């Protein structure tokens, strides 16, 4: 009632019309509950059902971890990566695509392309991309580019290609690091080529960087079927790392049963 009085004082014309309508039609302010059913009062009206539409098409964009850091790669680089992968089975079309699209990339885009190809284990395409980079005016010999490619080839059991890059790297007066030596030695031992593994080992001893422990551990384990070669590596290991121990297998300690 207080609100009605305040309203009537502020809006006298509106209030007079409003009260006249109430007096003429008293039914508008009366609410009848007699016609309502108990079921309606006790149970609320359920909401109308709705349908959710789920898209079942693929929009063609790369999904998931395949394109990690995709936002950091430019559109031109993404286009080149997709084109290289699409044409990798056709050498003629691939060479044409490289001439028309890859060579016009900027430096950062080229580096992004080779990095993404290596991450996706497209080593053959990464090597082609590396050959393009070597022809650029801004290219300088980079041991890390060689390292990534050689390690990828060694893990893929493509030792001939790995050693071809190895020789190119040495011609540019670059030296592998411990991880590169380790993966190449492990690759040759896995392929059953202990002589090639020992050649890489001898090259490691001549490196200007001091050798690390891991390549020796890989050789000591992989040369168990070749005791003469293993004893030589073990002797060098004990001289270079006197505080370390080269553990022999039980049959060498206690003798064969």
UniProtKB/Swiss-Prot annotation:
Statement: the UniProt record of this protein carries the keyword Translocase: no
Q: Which organism is it from?
A: Arabidopsis thaliana (Mouse-ear cress)
Q: What is this protein called?
A: Protein THYLAKOID ASSEMBLY 8-like, chloroplastic
Q: Could you say what the effect of mutating residue 155 to E is?
A: Abolished RNA binding
Q: What is the lineage of its organism?
A: Eukaryota, Viridiplantae, Streptophyta, Embryophyta, Tracheophyta
Family stated for the protein in its record: Belongs to the PPR family. P subfamily.
Give me the gene this protein comes from: THA8L
Each PPR repeat occupies one of these ranges, namely: 142-176, 177-211
- Does the keyword Manganese feature in the UniProt annotation? no
Q: What is the effect of changing residue 157 to E?
A: Reduced RNA binding
How is this protein annotated for GO cellular component? chloroplast
């Amino acid at each position: 009632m207080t609100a009605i009085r305040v309203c009537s004082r502020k809006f006298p014309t509106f209030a007079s019309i409003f009260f006249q309508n109430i007096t003429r039609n008293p039914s508008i302010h009366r609410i009848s509950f007699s016609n309502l059913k108990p079921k309606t009062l006790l149970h609320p009206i359920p909401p109308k059902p709705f349908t959710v539409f789920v898209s079942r098409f693929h929009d063609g964009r790369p999904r998931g971890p395949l394109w990690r850091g995709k936002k950091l790669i430019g559109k031109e680089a993404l286009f080149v990566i997709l084109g290289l992968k699409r044409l990798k089975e056709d050498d003629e079309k691939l060479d044409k695509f490289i001439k028309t699209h890859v060579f016009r990339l900027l430096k950062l885009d080229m580096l992004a392309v080779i990095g993404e190809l290596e991450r996706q284990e497209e080593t053959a395409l990464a090597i082609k991309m590396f050959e393009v980079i070597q022809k650029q005016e801004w290219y300088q010999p980079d041991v890390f580019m060689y390292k990534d490619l050689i390690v990828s080839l060694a893990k893929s059991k493509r030792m001939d290609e790995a050693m071809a890059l190895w020789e190119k790297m040495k011609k540019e007066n670059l030296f592998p690091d411990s991880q590169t030596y380790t993966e190449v030695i492990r690759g040759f031992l896995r392929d059953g080529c202990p002589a090639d593994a020992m050649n890489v080992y001898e090259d490691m001893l001549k490196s200007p960087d001091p050798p690390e422990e891991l390549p020796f551990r890989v050789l000591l384990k992989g040369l168990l079927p070749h005791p003469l070669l293993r004893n030589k590596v073990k002797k060098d290991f004990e001289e270079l790392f006197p505080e370390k121990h080269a553990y022999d297998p039980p049959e060498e300690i206690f003798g064969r049963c």
